[in-house]
Amino acid sequence: MMTTESVASKTSDSTNGTAPTDIPATVARLRQTFATGRTRDIEWRKRQLLQLVKLMEENEAALAAALAEDLDRSPFEAYIADIATTAGEAKYAAKRVRRWTRRKYQLLELPQLPGRGWVEYEPYGTVLIIGAWNYPYYLTLGPAVGAIAAGNAVILKPSEIAAASAHVMAELVPKYLDNDAIAVVEGDGAASQELIAQGLDRVLFTGGTEIGRKVYEGAAPHLTPCTLELGGKSPVIVAADADVEVAAKRIAWMKLLNAGQTCVAPDYVLADATIRDELVDKIGAAITKFTADKPDGMRVANQRQFDRISGYLSGGDGKVTVGGACDASSLRIQPAVVVDPDPNGPLMQNEIFGPVLPVITVQNLHEAIHFVNSRPKPLAAYLFTKRRETRERVIKEVPAGGMLVNHVAFQVSTAKLPFGGVGASGMGAYHGKWGFEEFSHRKSVLTKPTRPDLSSFIYPPYTERAFKMARRMF
């Protein structure tokens, strides 16, 4: 078990004190292990998944300390957002992996009889998971659950931006998991590029759209299939009939969690004009209450993040009604609400990924739907309403990776639903059975008897009788 003291001794430099990984040798080792068939064994998969649960549960303090160092995360938020979610995903898969791997027999058409057909779930081989810094365990070890359940060898590439968390992962994974089949590679973007260049069997990347394109381009020469979990501007539509008090609390909570550095955090709100002022006031009140223990604001990940987000606020776009003070020396930003910024300005054209919440006034639901649909498809879309008709209309008319009504972000943390993007917000999906299937090749298998040879009518020379039989069968 790792101690919190060992975390504190790590530096923020992801390469300091860490021997560089021989990437070709690591890939070769994992490929060799996969070739032996070890990872295909169902009991091996279950053991690795249960060991991952132990890793998360036995090292909670060390994992939380690393998250505090990297992201100023509280122990409670570390637990619910990274530790418990990852462990829960692994427990869920361990209980069901045998069922998931069973052959799925299909009823064949008449021309295919006699015969049996089924789908065989086959692991891809050696796969790469490139994690994100904002939830360094859940977005790296979480996807690994599906990859392990599917029987793959797995390379984990944590983000160098969350350096302490990456170090913890690199130290703990070999102690709990099969190091010849599951390996951690630390490093920056160059390490990711070198890994992709090895021509691995599948890649899952979580991060921004711009880097996602580069990952896709790097994988293309090898025809490596990719799962891309990207981002975008996730809207919240607050209808005129919404429970404004509850909506305000839930929106504020998620915008503050991890300092708003969450891919499915509310990026902006579209508020009906009749409740706009009340909503803004109550979001402001919720922010004030929720941040009483952080009067200096929320710390963002690094200088680049701080400069980008503070730049949105200093641009003078829209009316700042709450917060907005920035301290460059501590990288802290007071959570801000900005009312009616320019829809074509930087604040509304770029994913914010920080504690700044624009609120746009709309006159009706039609205007809100049109506003969302005039922009790239988001990773998540949210709606607050009491009316079934409003709910059904938004579900049907607003394309998004996922949607949640009357709350925010919970669609990501269930193993019973797939999580993924669409269009610019990504491709592919995982969690639960969908993660298993994402990392499995669905191989079609058909078997037929040789005697009696009922296929004789298809052999040349073709007769009129054979032609008549074919017409009846097809």
What are these regions (language model features)?
Residues 1-118:
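N-terminal Rossmann-like NAD(P)+-binding subdomain of aldehyde/semialdehyde dehydrogenases
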Residues 109-246, 362:
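Rossmann-like NAD(P) dinucleotide-binding subdomain of oxidoreductase/dehydrogenase enzymes
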